[in-house]
Amino acid sequence: MKKMTTLCAGLLFLLSSSVFAEEHLKEALEHANAAAVHGEDGDTAILIGHAKAALEQVLEASIVAKGVAKNHLNEAAKELQESIELANLGHIGSATLHAEAAVKHVKISDKYINSFVIINKP
């Protein structure tokens, strides 16, 4: 009986942590996309604001992510940090490229997290 309770508790934790990560990934993707779009428009300040918001959400999601998903979130965080730094230096074109790279990493991470949720749903 204790084993069954422990197993159920563990499964619930895994499912809830994946759902937690999904919420942050959605926000991160929206902000990273917005950063890239505003970068293409040359709006440095808006790019920086969205990149910072995306970075915050990526870091929150990476707390509970595991494996390949976590690796891609870490890469997305690096890309967003680089985007912010380059935008602050006035290199909007390079900053935009890093924001776009972050979008790709967040999307890949989302696929891995969603596939985990689908496999583990009762």
Map each language-model feature to its residues.
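Sec-dependent signal peptide recognition
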Residues: K2-A9, L14
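Long, charged/polar, soluble alpha-helical segments
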Residues: F13, S17-P122
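Generic cytosolic/nucleocytoplasmic N-terminal low-complexity/intrinsically disordered segments
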Residues: M1-K2, L25
